[in-house]
């Protein structure tokens, strides 16, 4: 029997960035940290300039002739690149419609579970379809189902707003919630907000009878 093939379990080699001493090209076109051109200089001279600035020499265009390097704070540059990548990934998230199903006679524990599910969906930027399922003659209790859905909307009002009010859909009653774009300001917070004080100017004192008589004399 031929030997079984072995799988290479070694961790993949992580590609290191081409910065500072890892740059091997003898001649480089260097851009300074302020964007000015330092021209084509030797690798050693470029490293010395970066060292004087207490910055890094980073290879930004290896295919150019000669290769182009820039003097910069590589740690800060890497942080900004990762931040941009996260923002781009967040923007590329396609909104989905997630569904939360329940019965109109749901108990408190199961209701809390459905609330937790809805919160997770909303935080992920997805819309939530809240569905109350009727079986048999339960269809006559649409009023109770609507009350339940509006209760759910109220409990989630800090994170969601109603996109579509409760309505019948076949043998079910549904409601759509969408993530709230602006934070909700509660009524109590509005009432507690300090009002801008209005400066009042006191009226001048009225002259006494004695003072009036003295002025007429």
UniProtKB/Swiss-Prot annotation:
GO terms for molecular function: ribosome binding; translation initiation factor activity. It is found in: Cytoplasm. The keyword Protein biosynthesis applies. GO terms for cellular component: cytosol; membrane. It comes from the Bacteria. Pfam families: IF3_C, IF3_N. InterPro entries: T_IF-3_C_sf, T_IF-3_N_sf, Translation_initiation_fac3_CS, Translation_initiation_fac_3, Translation_initiation_fac_3_C, Translation_initiation_fac_3_N. Its main location: cytoplasm. PROSITE patterns: IF3. Keywords: Cytoplasm, Initiation factor, Protein biosynthesis. GO terms for biological process: ribosome disassembly. SUPFAM superfamilies: Translation initiation factor IF3, C-terminal domain, Translation initiation factor IF3, N-terminal domain. PANTHER family: TRANSLATION INITIATION FACTOR IF-3, TRANSLATION INITIATION FACTOR IF-3, MITOCHONDRIAL. IF-3 binds to the 30S ribosomal subunit and shifts the equilibrium between 70S ribosomes and their 50S and 30S subunits in favor of the free subunits, thus enhancing the availability of 30S subunits on which protein synthesis initiation begins. Monomer. This is Translation initiation factor IF-3. It comes from Parasynechococcus marenigrum (strain WH8102).
